[in-house]
Amino acid sequence: MSLRSLTLALALLLSVLCPASLCAQEGAVERQPYLDLRRYYIGFRLGLHLPDVRITNSGAVNSLGGQLWADSPVWHPGFSIGVIGGVTLVPQLELRLLPTLHLGDVPVAYTDGSQEVERLSLRTSCLQLPLELKWAALRWGNYRPFVAAGGYAALQLGARSSELLYLLPIDYGLSIGAGCDLYFSFFKLSPQLTFHYGLANLLQTHRPDLQGDPRIRFTEAVRGMATRALLFTLSFE
C-alpha cells in the first residue's frame, strides 16, 4: 500500500470518527467542562507508525561493472509509546513535548535494473523528542478538532557500525498532524494522525571498514538516506 493511499485511509477514519462524535453532541452534557482551563497537564500515548526512508541512489558503477538501485518496496508497521507534557499558552493554543519510543524497521531492496539481487533490513527504532504547537477549535459538546505542527530531534537506536547501511545516530525534522479531542467522564481521548519528515542525511557514506569486502557495492550504491513516517496515535489525558 502506498503512503498516499494509507494516509487517505487514516484520514478517512478520522473524518468518520470526528463528525460522528460531533453529531452526537447536540443536547449532550459537557463532560469535564473545566479540563482545558488547566495551565499544565500530562498524559501518555500509544500508536502505530509506518517508517520509511527516502533513498538517493548514487548511480555508481560497482566492481562487477554494473549498477544497483535501492528502494523501500513495502511497509512494515511499528509500535510507538510515549508521554505527553503540555502547557496552555492561551485559550486554544498549547505547547507540547512528546518524548516517544518508536520500534520498527524498513526493508531496503536492491535491483540491477531487471531483478532484485539483495534485500536488507534497516533498523529505524529511535527515541524521538517532538516539540509541537497544538491549535484547537472551540469545543462543541464533548468534541474538539485540532491541528498540530512542530519539529523533532531523534536518537537512532540499535544500529551497528558493521551494517552495510549504517545510520548516524542523530536525526531531526518537521511534523504536521491533525486529530480530535473526545471528552469522557474520567479522561480525554485524542486520536491523531501525524506525518514526520526528516531533514538530515543519516547515511554514513565513508566506510573504510568495508574496503575489500565485495558487499561494499551495496553501500556505494546509495548516496543518501532521510527518514519519514506516518504515525497514528491515541492520547490519554
Which residues are covered by each model-predicted region?
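Residues on the lipid-exposed face of transmembrane beta-strands in outer-membrane beta-barrel proteins
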Residues: 44-48, 79-89, 99-101, 129-135, ...
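Extracellular loop and loop/strand-boundary signature of outer-membrane beta-barrel proteins
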Residues: 29-31, 66-71, 114-121, 160-166, ...
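Short glycine/proline- and aromatic-enriched beta-strand/turn motifs that initiate or cap beta-hairpins
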Residues: 24-78, 235-237
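Outer-membrane beta-barrel translocator domains and adjoining extracellular loop/strand segments
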Residues: 55-61, 107-115, 157-165, 202-210
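Predominantly the C-terminal beta-signal and adjacent terminal strand-loop region
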Residues: 29, 169, 183-237
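Residues that define the transmembrane beta-barrel architecture of outer-membrane proteins
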Residues: 38-40, 75-79, 123-129, 143, ...
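Repeated loop/turn-to-beta-strand initiation elements of outer-membrane beta-barrel proteins
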Residues: 92-95, 141, 186-189
